[in-house]
Design a protein with these regions (language model features):
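Compositional signal for N-terminal targeting/processing segments
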Residues: 1-226
């Protein structure tokens, strides 16, 4: 069952606090490094997420566990990776870890690395039907195993406990006895609009930069190019 934030009455809240709960947050990352406008929106998004989680914890229950899709590392390593790639997300979870929430890895390292490899192979395309069938078979097998790993980990959450799950995809199947809360701040719409409006100009800018970089490399190499 999925609840809408800000619309939980007191009797409902008391009932929800006794259940298993999962707070879902979309993992928006810095898709345009160096773009200050996008980084400002990104900060606004994660600040809004943090505020909504604060309110949700007061109503439905404190966060006992934190999971991040795609992370199989322990917290000391995971936090360093986040600091390099998504410091806004790190800020959101770091304060909660310091307050007592338990960060737990949601992925199995071997399974997740195989998923990455089979995904890359599948993206290359195939000449042979046999190779295509083998790849598809192994990809489906790894996906099924991963779904079981994630489901089993979430199923360890006990009644009355809550977990924050920062997700990158929407294809997960959650335990049926778990109350699901989708944390979606208005700033997400603003960010999506910005991406839509600026994507073409950003792509043109990146292509122009690539051409300039190639030109510089040609000059440095001393080779003549048409």
């Amino acid at each position: 069952m999925s609840e809408e934030l800000g619309k939980i009455s007191k009797p409902q809240a008391e009932n929800v606090q006794l259940k298993k709960k999962l707070y879902l947050v979309q993992n928006i990352q810095n898709y345009f490094p160096g773009n200050k406008d996008f980084e400002s929106l990104l900060k606004e998004y994660w600040d809004s997420i943090s505020d909504q989680l604060d309110n949700l914890e007061k109503t439905a229950g404190n966060i006992n566990f934190i999971y991040i899709e795609g992370m199989y590392q322990e917290y000391d390593v995971a936090s360093k990776l986040l600091n390099d790639n998504n410091k806004w997300c790190l800020s959101t979870i770091e304060s909660r870890v310091k307050s007592g929430s338990n960060y737990k890895k949601i992925e199995n390292e071997n399974n997740y690395k195989q998923l990455i490899d089979w995904t890359r192979i599948a993206q290359l395309g195939f000449v042979s039907e046999n190779a295509k069938e083998v790849t598809e078979e192994n990809y489906k097998k790894i996906i099924t195993e991963r779904s079981t790993i994630i489901h089993d980990e979430l199923n360890r959450i006990k009644e009355g406990e809550a977990a924050l799950f920062i997700i990158s995809s929407g294809s997960h199947k959650f335990p049926e006895d778990m109350e699901i809360f989708n944390v979606i701040p208005p700033s997400l719409d603003k960010m999506n609009r910005w991406i839509t409006e600026n994507q073409n100009s950003l792509q043109d800018s990146n292509q122009e930069k690539e051409v300039q970089d190639e030109g510089e490399q040609d000059k440095q190499s001393g080779l003549w190019t048409p």
